[in-house]
Amino acid sequence: MLKRRKSFALTLTAAAVPAFGLCPSLGWAGALLGGAAAAWILNRTERALRGRSLAKAAACGAVGRAAAAVSALGLFGLALWAAGRSRLAFPETAGSPLAAALIFALSFWAARSGAEAVGRCAAVLLPLLAVLYGVILVFSLSQLRLSWLLPTGTPRAGLRACASLLLPGAALFLRREDGVSVSRGTAIAALAAAAAAAVTAGTLSPPGAAARAAFLTVSRSVSILGVIQRFEALISGAMLMSGFCLCTLLLLAARELLDSLAPKKSSAAVKTSAFAAGLIFLWLPTPETFRLTGVTAICGGVACAFLLFVVSKNKSQKNEENA
């Protein structure tokens, strides 16, 4: 069972991937509104669960178990997507699958160690990430152009921000200590994403901010006491560490769903097959990888939404019986 501090640290560390890797290219308005929507959705889900694990609450009945199985597959696909995004930490070698395969291998190994071990790792990483990103945001303010901070983007950008900031909500599938709020961490991540998007657009211009790994470009021109500092190596490391936490969180959620379906531990053959399939998947050409993970993620997202429907339906039935 995850303690409150470790769960909060794991949620925020995992949320750094969409907050600083994806949302800066979507505009600060889209990041803020999408993040607020994601936090609201997770808050409503937490209220429906009443402290229970989403995996335990949903895996009841044939329909719920079928949706849980599809959700587990979708979470595995999202973990592969998160590992694949690790390539963007090194734009010059973005075509190499080595970083993605390494992050997936480490995440798979960490997920086998349990949520407590991953939570301890996130509790150590979170202060380092907060200081690093905070320094870049603060010292980039002197380069902002107010004319570039006008709201830009489309409703689609807000939807993308909402979907990406929902990923740390995978912590709802884990067993957590009472009083742990995943939506609170998501709300903080939404504010960080909006700040990163505003700094990126105000420094690079809105067209420049639309490029991939735009925040990494901002880190290359940070000036401290009149001297240009090169933070891109540190940012690349931070992106890898947060990608590791997100990938591990998604794998832990998938494992929790499978354990709720089959209380007995999965065999070594199943784990080895999943590990081998993931590595082969990540070594595919990049367009095919993202296309396949996209389809899997969409199926998993639909199944997760259906799980929420099952949970809310079971809750209403119990309320009627108690009445």
What is each residue range found by the language model?
Residues 17-100, 104-105, 304:
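Membrane helical hairpin/interfacial module
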Residues 204-232:
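Membrane-interface interhelical connector segments
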Residues 25, 262-268, 280-299:
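Extracellular/periplasmic helix-loop-helix junctions in multi-pass membrane proteins
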